[in-house]
Each structure stands twice: as structure tokens, then as C-alpha cells.
A protein has these predicted regions:
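DNA polymerase processivity clamps
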Residues: 1-115
Length: 115
């Protein structure tokens, strides 16, 4: 699967959603469907935070989890307006690419997220 997402929107949404997650893992769940990326995080004491952003994606809905800190670390250094996420399934490594600079490539491992 391949997703195109606005980098700044993704960063802002991740910061909002991860604001309540635990300091150690900072888990965030990405629910991907046609045209929409829904980000979720929760903490037992505080509840759940959900945010949605528009994306370029045409395919079957699926979900994948990540450590939000790792995602933010990659997104902050990319110097393009949009980024591309590529992965095979919810447990395979995800490749993050710039849509402008073909030399930029980062790989991030998913996190099993259940709630």
C-alpha cells in the first residue's frame, strides 16, 4: 500500500494525538481508508484522542500502529510538502519517502497497538 500525506498536517495531528500517550512507548494507531487517515491514541486515566486528516490512498481499509516519537523524528527532517508511506501489511516495516528528494528514505517498524 502507498499513502501520500501532507507532512505538516501529519506532524500536527501526531502531536495532538500523542499528547496523552505514555512517555515510554507513545503508541499511536493509524486507521487508513480511502482518502482519510484517522489517528488515535489513548491512556486509561485520560481517555482517547482522535484526529483525522486527508490523504491520497486508494485501497482497502487497514490499521497500523507506531511509536509516535519515532514517526515525528522522521517527519521533522523531511524537506518536502508531502511524504509517501509504503508498507505491505500492519506488521511489516514501513518506508517513509520524500515526494521531492528521491535520496531520502527512512524505515520505521510498526508497534502492535490494541485498544
Amino acid at each position: 500500500m502507498e499513502i501520500i500525506v501532507n507532512r505538516e498536517s501529519f506532524i500536527n495531528s501526531l502531536r495532538i494525538v500523542s499528547s496523552i500517550s505514555s512517555e515510554k512507548l507513545r503508541p499511536v494507531k493509524l486507521l487508513i481508508s480511502q482518502g482519510v487517515l484517522k489517528l488515535e491514541s489513548e491512556k486509561a486515566d485520560y481517555g482517547e484522542v482522535v484526529d483525522e486528516i486527508e490523504i491520497g490512498y486508494e485501497g482497502d481499509p487497514f490499521q497500523i500502529g507506531f511509536n509516535s516519537r519515532y514517526l515525528l523524528d522522521v517527519l521533522i527532517v523531511i524537506e518536502s510538502e508531502d511524504i509517501k508511506l509504503e508498507c505491505k501489511n500492519s506488521m511489516s516495516p514501513t518506508i517513509i519517502k520524500s515526494t521531492v528528494d528521491e535520496s531520502f528514505l527512512s524505515v520505521i517498524m510498526p508497534l502492535r497497538v490494541e485498544w
